[in-house]
Structures are given as structure tokens and as C-alpha cells.
């Protein structure tokens, strides 16, 4: 009867006392980590950075992961922090070239930058990748209209003006435009181009 009540229908235990204690410790550690992450997020969001990673207050390269991990006593892998001279050289090379340099050129750049501080080839490669991504993120999306598209639009507008009567104020020329129903979602508008082609 006692065996049945422990393992059967009347209150079987899923975890041992040892497992429960381990779970309690894990939950406590998780709570501490969450608190540290909230603190880290708040401290990082209050530091203004330029697009290149420069901290305008101190004029040096700011790496939030290095600054935050040392403040909290967490151990992370060492990260490369370029000197101001290295950053200037990298920015100049980026402005001269187009995109990420080839492996041979990365070796040359690394040799040049090593005169101004520690650096590895992968640091140079990643810097160019990140710099390109930052510049793409900053560019507003551009829509270009070719001259033939502009001419087509002008011809269509002229033809429509000829069809509409003077007494209507020109509103009949817009009857062919289909306005989407407010019930349709954004997906309808995004997929519209697929059906036009």
C-alpha cells in the first residue's frame, strides 16, 4: 500500500530532493543573471556612440562588451580595441576602396596597423564587414525613376485629362485607381507586385 502511494496514483514524485535543490540553485543563478543583463542594458543604452564606434566624450574607441564585462566581473574572450590611429587608417582605406579587401590586401593592412598596436587579420576583416553593414544601414532606401517611366506617366496624365469633362473638376480621371480596402492587411500590399508582373 505504501509503495503504491509513492509510485502510483496518490502522489508520485517526479524529482528527488537532490534534483529539487539543484533546480533551486539554477533558478537563483538565472535570476542574478537577469538582473545583471538589465543593468548592462541600461548602462549601454545611456552611452552615445558615433557610427564608427567612437565615444565622443573620450575620443577613443568604445567596445560595450569589454566595458560592461569588466564592470560586472564576468569573464569574456578578449576583444580587439583599435587605437585612434588604427581607426583613422581603416576609415581612410574604407573610403578609398569598395567593400572588404581581398585576403592579400588584408595582410598588408594588418602589417601596417600592427605598427600602431596589436591586431590580427580577422580583426581587419571583421572591421570592414561591420563598417559596410553600418554604412548600408544608414543609407535611406532610394527609388529611382527612369526618364522613360516619367515620360509614360506624363502621357497617361495627358490622355486622362482629355477624357474627363470640364464640369467635374477632373475627379473622373481617378476612377481607374483601385484603393485597397482597410480590411486588407499589409501582406496584400506587399504581394501586389508579384501579381502585376
UniProtKB/Swiss-Prot annotation:
Record keywords, A-Z: Developmental protein, DNA-binding, Homeobox, Nucleus, Transcription, Transcription regulation
Annotation: DNA-binding region: 75-139
Any GO CC annotation of this UniProt entry: nucleus
Domain of life (superkingdom): Eukaryota
Entries under CDD domains matching the protein: homeodomain
SMART domains attached to this UniProt entry: HOX
Region (Disordered) location: 132-168
Family: Belongs to the WUS homeobox family.
Name the UniProt record assigns to this protein: Putative WUSCHEL-related homeobox 10
UniProt xrefs under InterPro entries: HD, Homeodomain-like_sf, WOX13-like
Biological role: Potential transcription factor that plays a central role during developmental processes.
Main location: nucleus
Location of this chain's protein in the cell: Nucleus
